[in-house]
Every structure is written in structure tokens, then in C-alpha cells.
């Protein structure tokens, strides 16, 4: 149940953000709470990387379909 783990992690971060608990993740959350513009900057930085991965996957799928169209396995001597 991955959603249970994610929800538990969210709860831990919420607890860390409201208390004096220090960890790498808690510091990041506390910085985002202090300056919400950092959230937009972080999202903008990761968006182009995600788009290039999607484009690469589309290209790979196109190449796979082209190969499968050329040889459909009906030849007896190859």
C-alpha cells in the first residue's frame, strides 16, 4: 500500500514542520513554508526534465513499432 507510506511520510513532515525536529526533509518543508515562491521555482526546475523523459519514451515507442512492422514473423527461412 504505497499510499499508506506516502500519507505517513506527509504526517511526519507536518509534525516536523510544526515542532523543532530537525532533518533534511523537515528543513526543506520549513523553507517552503517561510517562502512559498521556492515551491514554484522547484516545480519549474523539474518540469523540463520530466518533459524530455516523456519525449524520449515516445521516440522509443515509435522505433519499436517501426521494427515490429518490418518483420511480423511470417518468413520461414529467417
Swiss-Prot record:
Keywords linked to the UniProt accession: Allergen, Cytoplasm, Nucleus, Ribonucleoprotein, Ribosomal protein
Positions of region (Disordered): 40-78
Record has Transport as a keyword: no
GO (cellular component) term, any one: cytosolic large ribosomal subunit
InterPro entries (UniProt xref): Ribosomal_protein_uL10 (IPR050323)
Record GO terms (molecular function): large ribosomal subunit rRNA binding; structural constituent of ribosome
Gene Ontology biological-process annotations: cytoplasmic translation; ribosomal large subunit assembly
Domain of life of the native organism: Eukaryota
Low complexity compositional bias, start-end: 40-50
Protein location: Nucleus; Cytoplasm
Methyltransferase recorded as keyword: no
UniProt feature, compositional bias: Basic and acidic residues: 51-64
Disulfide bonds: none
Major localization class: nucleus
Function: Ribosomal protein P0 is the functional equivalent of E.coli protein L10.
Quaternary structure and interacting proteins, as annotated: P0 forms a pentameric complex by interaction with dimers of P1 and P2.
Family label: Belongs to the universal ribosomal protein uL10 family.
The protein's name: Large ribosomal subunit protein uL10
Origin species: Culicoides nubeculosus
